[in-house]
UniProtKB/Swiss-Prot annotation:
Residue positions binding Cu cation: 65, 131, 136, 140
Species, as recorded: Methylobacillus flagellatus (strain ATCC 51484 / DSM 6875 / VKM B-1610 / KT)
CDD domains named among the record's database cross-references: Azurin
Keyword flag Electron transport: yes
GO MF annotation, one: copper ion binding
GO cellular component: periplasmic space
Signal peptide residues on this chain, from the entry's feature table: 1-18
Residue ranges of domain Plastocyanin-like in the record: 19-148
Lineage of the species this protein comes from: Bacteria, Pseudomonadati, Pseudomonadota, Betaproteobacteria, Nitrosomonadales
Pathway field: One-carbon metabolism; methylamine degradation
Disulfide bond entries: 22-45
Gene of this entry: azu
Protein name in the entry: Azurin
Cellular location(s): Periplasm
Function according to Swiss-Prot or TrEMBL: Probable electron acceptor for methylamine dehydrogenase.
Keywords: Copper, Disulfide bond, Electron transport, Metal-binding, Periplasm, Signal, Transport
């Protein structure tokens, strides 16, 4: 009985940390893949931070990566518009309200982050994150969900 209680108590700090976690670490390397395919954002978070790291060796101009949040229905059109915007604008169409949050492009070994208010996300809507570097979005994509 005592061992069962100790076993159960061992998980309490983990559960509490997960419940109050309002940031996530995301990375991508030269293989053009994020280290995660989904991110859960607690509705209780006033702000949420994405810490992004390019774990590869390729330069920003050669194969930069970033993290962009948008409604899933908008990602393909945003990716096309991003190619037109070019690398100087992080392959992000300037002042486009469909872009909900993003990090700048970074090259191998570099890190960046973005903080946003989860209140911009609506219940029942489908959201995705992707890399906006030219033509990366088709392989580098994941889902974002609001969770209780």
């Amino acid at each position: 009985m005592r061992n069962q209680l100790l076993f159960a108590l061992a998980f309490i700090p983990t559960i509490a940390a997960a419940a109050s976690n309002c940031e996530v670490n995301v990375s991508a390397g030269d293989s053009m893949a994020f280290n995660t395919r989904s991110i859960d954002i607690p509705k209780s978070c006033k702000e949420f931070t994405v810490n992004f790291a390019h774990t590869g060796t390729a330069s920003k101009a050669g194969m930069g990566h970033n993290w962009v949040l948008a409604r899933s229905a908008d990602v393909n059109d945003l990716a096309k518009a991003g190619v037109e915007a070019g690398i100087d604008k992080n392959f992000i169409p300037p002042n486009d309200p469909r872009v909900l949050a993003y990090t700048p492009l970074v090259g191998g070994g570099e890190k960046t982050s973005v903080t946003f208010k989860p209140s911009i996300l609506k219940d029942g809507e489908s959201y995705s994150f992707y890399c906006s570097f030219a033509f990366h979005s088709f392989m580098m994509r994941g889902t974002v969900k609001l969770v209780d």
